[in-house]
Regions:
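Aromatic (tryptophan-biased) beta-strands that constitute blades/sheets of beta-rich domains
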Residues: 21-70, 104-119, 155-164, 206-214, ...
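Repeat-blade elements of multi-bladed beta-propeller folds
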Residues: 36-40, 73-92, 119-145, 170-194, ...
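Blade-loop segments of beta-propeller domains
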Residues: 68-82, 92-134, 164, 287, ...
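Hydrophobic or amphipathic alpha-helical targeting/insertion segments
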Residues: 100, 105, 128-162, 167-213, ...
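Loop/turn-rich, solvent-exposed surfaces of beta-rich toroidal or solenoidal domains
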Residues: 309, 407, 437-501
Length: 563
């Protein structure tokens, strides 16, 4: 049973909530620095801002303008949206509209869901944000629902059921509105669920289509699951895609196959660990590219897909770029899926290289052993990946991607076959992720994580700045020559985009696992990010640097101190 609370501010100085966010507004989002209308700050997900008021020379004067309590002790991974003087922010249990200049709450809509929902959430109770379109704010709800709210009042317009926790599903990602369709994905590969992407009518909430990411017998791709197509699982779609409105193509990443053990699912296991190009009106898959066929390592390929125009091979291309969890950075022609570049950007021993003629990885000898389920191996990157869901940014001025990357390996040990036979791999069962024993390998004395400035066509880092713990936050790059990101020890930092030098830092009192954004209001540039992390006992044992970081969610907004 859901409950809705509307809290109205009593001041007469609140901004007027405009009825905007047309398809044209969303298409032009990258060119409207006074707004943040989409996840990724534009359809391209470059997370680049043309604003320069906050720059290398002025950032030392950056101070908090206000902070808003999210009244939550879970992970605050949400990205704020900003329109006409209002910030819209989500947590797992609420959506709020806030005055950008004062931090005062305009309205708040609460959400409730059954306690058992947490049983099918793999890696934390969180929400990553929403979408704006035609006077509505769209979001997903953890227990498998999609919701539309009135942006003026916070009142619910529609609320529809997509999936159930009994089937092993959860929903944590921000929706994408493309060509008038609200598009969402699901989590659940660790619970043997079958991934899908869905499109909804923005006005009514009626489901328009569903595209499954793993086939059933007789469907295209079923031949890549020999003897297993009837039970194929995985391919979760738990982050948010990008959109090229000129090509009318949505690009969405898919997760790992289930179970982790690859012995009984020989074959490529399409369309897991892939990038899919989809028509938003119909859900038709136009092309796909798979990064990790027959994946035994949990290398979810759901990382942000960045759209840009770059020179590759002496020619200008409309490309998509992805720093993947498996340690390779892929550049594809987004018109047809042709692979243009694939290079390691982090330590990756599971594959020697990517064969550019076939587009397939050349497996290492160690990977072949684990695929045959015969003996333990050491492998890089670890199960969390060279990066994870937290989005990178790209500057068209420097031509570099700014990526938070982990520097951790893993020892894999296959479970005995007799134990595998006892596992229940039915949808909704946790065993989907428990068929291989893992032990992390930490570098000593090297940093466990880096912020890297990477040439996307070569994978080479112009610079890298080390951190004791891997950062779990998104990055933001600006024309002011700065990269903003957060640390798990609670600092928001500003880094020189050309050198990697940390120029400014601020302690927010809880770990930052959110996504910084910037915009301007009445001639003043602001930076906003969520703060709030929750670490389980295992995480605290493995990383003493985050063992004592407090919990507690907040939304922080900064501006320059007047001279």
């Amino acid at each position: 049973m859901k409950r809705i609370l509307i809290a109205s501010a009593l001041t007469i100085s609140l901004p007027t909530l405009a009825f905007a966010q047309s398809a044209a507004d969303l298409k032009n989002a990258a060119n409207t620095p006074d707004r943040v209308l989409t996840y990724g700050m534009s359809y391209s997900q470059q997370r680049f801002s043309t604003l320069t008021q906050i720059n290398r020379g002025t950032v030392k004067r950056l101070v908090p303008a206000w902070a808003y309590s999210l009244d939550d002790s879970n992970k605050e991974e949400s990205q704020a949206l900003v329109m006409d003087g209002v910030i819209y922010i989500t947590a797992h249990d609420k959506t709020a509209a806030i005055n950008v200049e004062t931090g005062r709450e305009i309205w708040k809509t609460m959400i409730s869901y059954p306690p058992e929902t947490a049983m099918t959430v793999c890696c934390g109770i969180e929400n990553r944000g929403g979408a704006l379109y035609n006077g509505k704010f769209f979001r997903t709800i953890l227990d498998g629902r999609v919701q539309a709210l009135d942006i003026k009042t916070g009142k619910e317009i529609w609320n529809v059921r997509s999936s159930t926790t009994a089937e092993g599903y959860a929903m944590t990602g921000a929706p994408l509105v493309a060509n008038g369709v609200v598009i969402v994905g699901v989590a659940g590969a660790e619970f043997s669920s079958r991934g899908y992407i869905e499109g909804y009518d923005a006005e009514t909430g009626n489901r328009l289509w569903r595209l499954y990411t793993v086939p059933r017998p007789g469907e295209r791709g079923a031949e890549t699951w020999p003897n297993q197509a009837a039970n194929a699982a995985g391919g979760s779609t738990w982050t948010t895609g990008s959109y090229d409105p000129d090509l009318d193509l949505v690009y969405w990443g898919t997760g790992n196959p289930s179970p982790h053990n690859a012995l009984d699912r020989k074959g490529d296991n399409l369309y897991t660990d892939s990038i899919l190009a989809i028509r938003p009106k119909s859900g038709e898959m136009v092309w796909h590219y798979q990064t990790s066929p027959n994946d035994p390592f949990d290398y979810d390929n759901v990382q942000s897909v960045i759209l840009a125009e770059i020179n590759s091979g002496g020619s200008q291309h409309k490309v998509l770029m992805q720093a993947a969890r498996n340690g390779f950075l892929y550049v594809l022609d987004r018109t047809n899926g042709e692979l243009l570049a694939a290079n390691k950007y982090a330590k990756a021993t599971w594959a020697e290289r990517v064969d550019m003629a076939t587009g397939r990885p050349v497996w290492s000898e160690e990977t072949k052993k684990i695929l045959d389920h015969v003996e333990k191996i050491q492998n890089w990157p670890y199960i969390g990946g060279a990066t994870n869901w937290y989005p990178p940014s790209y500057s068209p001025l420097t031509g570099l991607m700014y990526v938070n990357s982990a520097n951790i390996g893993v020892e894999y040990e296959p479970l005995p076959l007799e134990e595998l036979r006892k596992l229940n791999l039915a949808a909704g069962g946790r065993s989907g992720g428990n068929t291989i024993k893992t032990t992390n390998i930490f570098p000593d004395p090297e940093p466990r994580g880096y912020l890297k400035a990477i040439n996307p066509t070569t994978g080479e880092a112009k610079w890298q700045t080390g951190f004791k713990s891997p950062n779990w936050a998104g990055t933001l790059v600006t024309a002011g020559g700065l990269v903003f990101t957060g640390t798990r020890t609670g600092e928001l930092i500003a880094v020189d985009a050309d050198t990697g030098e940390i120029l400014w830092r601020f302690q927010t009192s809880s770990g930052i696992v959110g996504q910084p954004v910037t915009w301007q209001q009445n001639g003043t540039q602001y930076v906003t990010v969520t703060s709030g992390d929750r670490n389980n006992d295992n995480a605290r044992r493995q990383d003493p640097n985050i063992a004592n970081v407090p919990m507690g969610g907040s939304l922080w907004t900064f501006k320059l101190l007047a001279q």
